[in-house]
Amino acid sequence: MRECISIHVGQAGVQIGNACWELYCLEHGIQPDGQMPSDKTIGGGDDSFNTFFSETGAGKHVPRAVFVDLEPTVIDEVRTGTYRQLFHPEQLITGKEDAANNYARGHYTIGKEIIDLVLDRIRKLADQCTGLQGFLVFHSFGGGTGSGFTSLLMERLSVDYGKKSKLEFSIYPAPQVSTAVVEPYNSILTTHTTLEHSDCAFMVDNEAIYDICRRNLDIERPTYTNLNRLISQIVSSITASLRFDGALNVDLTEFQTNLVPYPRIHFPLATYAPVISAEKAYHEQLSVSEITNACFEPANQMVKCDPRHGKYMACCLLYRGDVVPKDVNAAIATIKTKRSIQFVDWCPTGFKVGINYQPPTVVPGGDLAKVQRAVCMLSNTTAIAEAWARLDHKFDLMYAKRAFVHWYVGEGMEEGEFSEAREDMAALEKDYEEVGVDSVEGEGEEEGEEY
C-alpha cells in the first residue's frame, strides 16, 4: 500500500487541513465520526483511499495526518469542531506560545521544544504504514510557525526518512490579506532552508485565490473559509489520483518525475477549472474543451504570473469526472494550434494526461457549483520566477534598512542567515532564467518550427 502522511503546520496549514479533510470525507463517504458505511472490508483492506486513511478494528477511518501549531487556539477549534471524533487526540499537537510571525522563533527557540514530540507522532503514523510513499506538508510562507517550524521539520524529515518524497503546499503571502509586515523575511528564510529538502512545492498565492473568489464566485469580501475551500478543491484534484484508482500520477514520485526537470526547479503552477458559482452553472455548458481552455487563462492560476512570458518545461492535465480520452485529445490539439504555448526547446511538447472517473464533490453550503467534470493543470513554467522576484523585491526594501531584523537576531539568528537566504533566492531566479534560455546547438534551423 502506498500511504501518504499529511502534516499541517501553523494556522494556515491547519485551516487548509480542515477544509481538505472535510472534502476527503465527503468524497469517500466517510462520516464525521470516521465510520464509512460503503466500506466492506473492516479493519484494513487494500482500497485506494487507505493511502490517506487508516482503519481501526472497529471500522473507524482515521486520517493519516498530524496537525501542529505552536499556539493552541486554532487546533482547539478542530478539537471541538464537527470532525473532532475523526482525529486521534495525539494527532493534534499544540504548543503554549506562538511564533509571533517570527521565523527564528518557529525554527529555533519555540520550535525546538516541540519538534521531537511531532517527529515521534509522525513516526507512530509511519509505523502503521506498510509502504509509506511520502509526506504532504501544508503551511504558509508568511507566518512564524508556517515558515520557521516547517523548515525545521523538513530538515528533520530528511534525516529520518531520507528517501521519502516530500511535497509542499505553501501559501504565498499576498498584499490584500497580509497578516504581518515581516512576511517577505519569513518567506525567503523558509524557502532557502527547505529548498534542498522539498521534492515538489505547489505554491498558492492568496491574492490569486482571492481574485478567483471575487471574480468567479461573486464573493465581494472573501474570507479565509472561502479561500480554503477553493484551495481544498485543488489539493483534492492533485491527490485524487492517489486516493482513487487512477491511471496517472498514482504515486508521489510520479509527480516529480513528470514535473521536476532539475531538483531546484520544483515549483509547479497549479490551475483549476471550472470555478463557478451555482447560479451561473445552470447557464453554462462546461465541456472538456472549455475547461481545458480555461486552464491556460492566467486568471485561473493559483499564483499570479504570466505563463505567456515564460516557457513551459512540463505540463500535466488531471481530469476528473465524465471525461473521455477522445475529448481530451481534441481539446489539447486545439490548444496547441491556437495558444501561444512555448515549451523550452530541450523538452518535448507533450501534455501528460490523467483521468479519474470520480466526479468532483462539493461541500454542501459551499460556494462552488456541483459540476460533472473538472480539471487541474500542473505545469512547470519559468514564469513562476515572477513570484520570487516580487518577494525578493519586498525583502530588499526592508532589509536595506535592516527593519525588524533585531527580532530575529534576538531569537538567536545571525544576520548572515538573511544575506545567505537572499543570495540563494537570487540564484533560484537565475536558475529559472537559465532554464528558459535556448540551448546553443540547434539555433539557426528550427526557430520557426516549434509547432
Curated annotation (Swiss-Prot):
It is found in: Cytoplasm, Cytoskeleton. The active site is at E254. Transmembrane segments: none annotated. Keywords: Acetylation, Cytoplasm, Cytoskeleton, GTP-binding, Hydrolase, Isopeptide bond, Magnesium, Metal-binding, Microtubule, Nucleotide-binding. The modification N6-acetyllysine is found at K40. Its EC number is 3.6.5.-. It catalyses: GTP + H2O = GDP + phosphate + H(+). Mg(2+) binds at E71. Its cofactor is Mg(2+). InterPro entries: Alpha_tubulin, Tub_FtsZ_C, Tubulin, Tubulin/FtsZ-like_C, Tubulin/FtsZ_2-layer-sand-dom, Tubulin/FtsZ_GTPase_sf, Tubulin_C, Tubulin_CS. A motif (MREC motif) lies at residues 1-4. Pfam families: Tubulin, Tubulin_C. GTP binds at Q11, E71, S140, G144, T145, T179, N206, N228. The modification 5-glutamyl polyglutamate is found at E445. The keyword Transferase does not apply. One of its GO terms (molecular function) is metal ion binding. Its main location: cytoplasm. GO terms for biological process: microtubule-based process. Residues 432-451 are annotated as: Disordered. Tubulin is the major constituent of microtubules, a cylinder consisting of laterally associated linear protofilaments composed of alpha- and beta-tubulin heterodimers. Microtubules grow by the addition of GTP-tubulin dimers to the microtubule end, where a stabilizing cap forms. Below the cap, tubulin dimers are in GDP-bound state, owing to GTPase activity of alpha-tubulin. Dimer of alpha and beta chains. A typical microtubule is a hollow water-filled tube with an outer diameter of 25 nm and an inner diameter of 15 nM. Alpha-beta heterodimers associate head-to-tail to form protofilaments running lengthwise along the microtubule wall with the beta-tubulin subunit facing the microtubule plus end conferring a structural polarity. Microtubules usually have 13 protofilaments but different protofilament numbers can be found in some organisms and specialized cells. The MREC motif may be critical for tubulin autoregulation. PANTHER family: TUBULIN (PTHR11588). Belongs to the tubulin family. This is Tubulin alpha chain.
